[in-house]
Amino acid sequence: MTDALDTPRFQRLAEPWTHSTKLGSTLLVPGIRLLSLPSLGTFDQLQLLRDLPVSGYALFAAENFNEKLDEILISTQGKVQNTKHDPIPQSQPFQTAAFRYAGLQKEWQFLWEKSEQAPNAVTTSANFKNQYQELQNALNQLAILPSASNLISAKVSLTRFQSQFKSWMSVPVQENPYQVKVWENRLITIESLLRYAERRVINKATFN
């Protein structure tokens, strides 16, 4: 849990963990201490965590969650939808990886359709779409049928996709470098989910 009354300090405390190369297959879920933290400050810290390469976040403690904070979240994100079918990272890492990546795809599709910030050439655009669909297929297959072979396929597809991502984003990064960095962080989170799942699921069972 990170205890900070301002977002810059919160970021300084969180980043050594979010950028650590020593966590291995550990899922990182930072916590925000709500006591004495203004509602707008809480929202600011929540937004920061959404943009970092973490698996989620926790709010501590429930009795400090107030009506004003609830109103801010509703006004910026809408009313909370029924999320009972959303996968849980700790217990459903493969499904979570596919689910999170599907959300990324929707953002990219919106970008290409609603703006001119497309990949830097027609051939690159076609290659990007082929590669991101290939990765989605690999993650979906892994979520449906967890196995060592499907995990290898998903990891290979993800590594290949990440290696070309900066090249594909050479135009968008000029207009909105922060957003591109957020996307890179979300790909890192998916990579972390696969590492966690490999240790938790694949290495503890025998698959054909």
Where do the model's predicted regions map?
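Catalytic domains of carbohydrate-active enzymes that cleave complex glycans
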Residues: 54-58, 95-207
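Substrate-binding cleft of secreted/luminal carbohydrate-active enzymes
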Residues: 1-10, 16-20, 24-114, 161-168
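Ampipathic, surface-exposed secondary-structure segments
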Residues: 4-26, 121-142
